[in-house]
Amino acid sequence: MNIGVPKEIKNNEFRVSTTAAGVHALVAAGHKVFVEQGAGVGSAISDEDYVKAGGTILNSADEVWEKSDLILKVKEPIKDEYHRIRSGQILFTYLHLAASRECTDALIKSGCVAIAYETVEVNRRSEEHTSELQSRQYLVCRLLLEKK
């Protein structure tokens, strides 16, 4: 699977969805990981770190979204990103859909498969939601790495 890590463009959001170690694990499982140039800068992860982990650095967000079957983000897409989302593409991020009808409508219109971090549970019997880190690690590692 082709996995994309675009740079976050929402105001005051400096995190990145995947560390170099995460990229290494995904690549080791047979996936291709495309990281937008500078995506990790706000989290002190260099492009070189991603390359050493097996990722491919792309120059633009458009390239990352275009080449990727799965997009890993931290925050919900904003208006400037809606046009990049395509039918059948998987978007895994915090969505907070109750707060944005516009985002909800854009996701529906795109035909993508949107998975919200805040709704992922580690234990199906548990009513407790996972932390940001747990939800990403669990779903990405469990689902993607098993598809090797």
Tell where the protein language model's regions lie, with residue ranges.
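Structural/interface elements that position substrates and couple domains in central-metabolism enzymes
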Residues: 1-127, 131
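Positively charged, low-complexity/disordered segments
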Residues: 132-148
